Amino acid sequence: QRDVRVLDPQTMQPVPQDGETMGEIMFRGNITMKGYLKNPAATEEAFRGGWFHSGDLAVQYPDGYIKIKDRSKDIIISGGENISSIEVEDVLYRHPAVIAAAVVAMPDEKWGETPCAFLEVKAGVHVTQEDIIAHCKQHLAGFKVPRHIVFGELPKTSTGKIQKFELRKQVGAAAAIAV
């Protein structure tokens, strides 16, 4: 027996299959683990409501197709609106000067959080924060456009995966200094 659904994590009810309403992908049945070794608190949290919470946010279409939008920890909540960091990163990667991009939440007094983009650009190419913001404004709703752009080498694992947790630390440290 196995069951996969896109559920609202607060109500544990299925989200509408409209291709727009985001929920969390959850599993139950013989396709899940029994729990975390010697960590009952983490097991209890992961299996809230009798379902394994994947941490992946997705939409479901009328035909049942599930499309992953982002990780729950990477969603930016700005003025009550959910912003997918992946959606913003996709737009940034389409800029001809960008070779690597990552977007994380930056604390904001007015909006709660706003997108902050970290970019690596091609050697010898001059691009400004204004250039990047103008590019984003052409492809994204205004509230999704990064308010801050940081240029430089991105921290990566030995396999080349961008370490967003390191970028979140940088943003947190900058926010603490600004206070």
Residue ranges and their predicted role:
Residues V4, G23, G29, K34-G35, ...:
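AMP-binding/adenylate-forming catalytic core of the ANL superfamily
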Residues L37-P40, F47:
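Short, flexible helix/strand-to-coil boundary loops that buttress conserved ligand/catalytic motifs
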Residues P9-Q13, K110-W111:
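Short, solvent-exposed loop/turn segments that connect beta-strands within catalytic domains
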Residues D8-T11, N39-A42:
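Active-site loops of AMP-binding adenylate-forming
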Residues Q1-D3, T11-G23, T32-K34, R48-G49, ...:
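Conserved ATP-binding loop and adjacent catalytic segment of the adenylate-forming AMP-binding
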Residues R5, I149-G152:
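General small-molecule cofactor/ligand-binding pocket signal
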Residues E130, A134, A174-A175, V179:
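N-lobe entry segment of adenylate-forming
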